[in-house]
Amino acid sequence: MKVILLRDVPKIGKKGEIKEVSDGYARNYLIPRGFAKEYTEGLERAIKHEKEIEKRKKEREREESEKILKELKKRTHVVKVKAGEGGKIFGAVTAATLAEEISKTTGLKLDKRWFKLDKPIKELGEYSLEVSLPGGVKDTIKIRVEREE
């Protein structure tokens, strides 16, 4: 029996693939559990259309991420924090703080998960920060942490 997989099935195939399986396996396991549907040309067209929509969505997401990254790389972003005499920060600068501060200055909507920090920043100075945006867009931006007046 020909089936179209609705999910990835180990040792059978990936979502959207058309596979030939035994009738019993399809009727007793794959179809009742929602892993597959019986093959029809209409269903195949619908799945191809769905894949095309998903592909376009990912492409738009990547383009949007590239625009955001281009805007982020234009300048060194300044984050002002309260600090003591030795350049030690009261508290720490986290990814959430960076996203919030950079959003204020650029007007872009940023997510804290896009900023990759090994550990929170605890001293004043300049830092290169890895940014990983949706759509697989990655690069580094410059951050300068300054004392708040």
Curated annotation (Swiss-Prot):
A molecular-function term among this protein's GO annotations: rRNA binding
Keywords on record: Ribonucleoprotein, Ribosomal protein, RNA-binding, rRNA-binding
Coiled-coil portions: none
Superkingdom per UniProt: Bacteria
GO cellular component: ribonucleoprotein complex; ribosome
GO BP terms in the entry: translation
Family: Belongs to the bacterial ribosomal protein bL9 family.
Function according to Swiss-Prot or TrEMBL: Binds to the 23S rRNA.
Name of the protein this chain belongs to: Large ribosomal subunit protein bL9
Source organism per UniProt: Thermotoga sp. (strain RQ2)
Lineage: Bacteria, Thermotogati, Thermotogota, Thermotogae, Thermotogales
Gene name of this polypeptide: rplI
